[in-house]
């Protein structure tokens, strides 16, 4: 059985379609590798790109794409709703078939070293490829974002510990090139589902409250003396925040479901929907960013479909309708479900 690995570079450009096309076209003709998805978001000013194929081909494609994005994107003029650290904010490798997490971590390390050496850009390793436990979470590495990077790399004031402050490879002092490129985080992880719940409000006041309630880390509260205590969140292995989507006139609870078996999409959706209802606001649908495992769709489909339905296609249809996945853009199952998209690409 041929090994297949997925790679999901997130680039910090979601508005200039011609620029996005130049970046993605740079890897369009690499043998053994297919581009499964290109999803730009103007509000986030970010594009999620999904590629999959033979490990050596995907690793080659990841380097070419990162190099092109570094050339094309100028972080000095970048603004968007989504947290980011550099021109390519994050680039994870995900084992799909016939490849181990350890092999994906080795791919991440080789790529991080190559990008730092050949592109002269600071790179961090995260997830299962992290060289320090404090760097496992992307959200930890990304604290302070691009705007805090200069102080972070210039021994200035920062919220980072010494263990997370400096990159694993590449320059460790701020310079003009880094001001343009920012830093890049490369790693390996299991399948993560990027899942956003649409909230019918123009600002993100309720979305932010919901995000702080559902995310696993919860929120800080203060007593009358000003002492702080962290209250855990509702959902398991979930990161979440509220953001505004000006282009659609709504807001979202933007989440990463780090283990979709422990927190299925319908659980996250119904939790957000109930909390929004408590504020007199509707959550009319949701959005998947990137690709999703078939099993995750089937699990949610079983919740929304009539009892006794077992056909995969019917369960997927029930999940799409129940979660409102086509509210913003049509959800095309053959292109968005990992197993189906890979089969389609291999057949071509």
Language-model features: where?
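Long, contiguous binding/interaction regions
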Residues: 1-348
């Amino acid at each position: 059985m041929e090994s297949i690995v997925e790679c999901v570079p997130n680039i910090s450009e979601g508005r200039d379609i011609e620029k996005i096309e130049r970046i993605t076209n740079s890897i369009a003709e690499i043998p053994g590798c297919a581009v499964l998805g290109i999803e730009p978001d103007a509000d986030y000013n970010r594009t999620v790109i999904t590629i999959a194929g033979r490990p050596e081909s995907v690793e080659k494609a990841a380097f070419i794409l990162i190099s092109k994005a570094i050339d094309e994107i100028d972080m000095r003029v970048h603004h968007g709703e989504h947290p980011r650290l550099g021109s390519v904010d994050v680039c994870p490798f995900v084992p799909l078939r016939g490849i181990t997490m350890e092999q994906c971590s080795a791919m991440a390390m080789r790529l991080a070293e190559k990008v730092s050496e050949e592109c002269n850009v600071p790179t961090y390793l995260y997830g299962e490829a992290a060289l320090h436990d404090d760097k496992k979470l992307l959200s930890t590495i990304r604290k302070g974002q691009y705007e805090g990077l200069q102080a972070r790399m210039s021994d200035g004031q920062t919220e980072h510990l010494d263990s997370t402050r400096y990159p694993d490879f590449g320059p460790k002092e701020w310079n003009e090139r880094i001001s343009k490129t920012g830093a890049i985080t490369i790693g390996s992880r299991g399948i993560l589902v990027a899942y956003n719940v649409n909230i019918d409000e123009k600002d993100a006041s309720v979305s932010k409250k919901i995000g702080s309630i559902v995310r696993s880390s919860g929120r800080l509260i203060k007593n009358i003396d000003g002492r702080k205590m962290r209250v855990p969140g509702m959902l398991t292995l979930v990161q979440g925040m509220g953001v505004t989507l000006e282009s659609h006139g709504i807001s979202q609870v933007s989440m990463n479901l780090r283990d979709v078996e422990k927190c299925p999409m319908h659980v996250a959706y119904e939790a957000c929907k109930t909390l929004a209802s408590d504020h007199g606001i509707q959550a009319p649908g949701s959005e998947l960013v990137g690709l999703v495992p078939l099993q995750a769709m089937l699990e949610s489909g079983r919740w929304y479909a009539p009892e006794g339905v077992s056909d995969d296609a019917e369960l997927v249809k029930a999940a799409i309708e129940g979660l409102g996945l086509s509210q913003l853009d049509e959800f095309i199952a053959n292109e968005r479900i990992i197993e189906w998209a890979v089969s389609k690409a291999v057949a071509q």
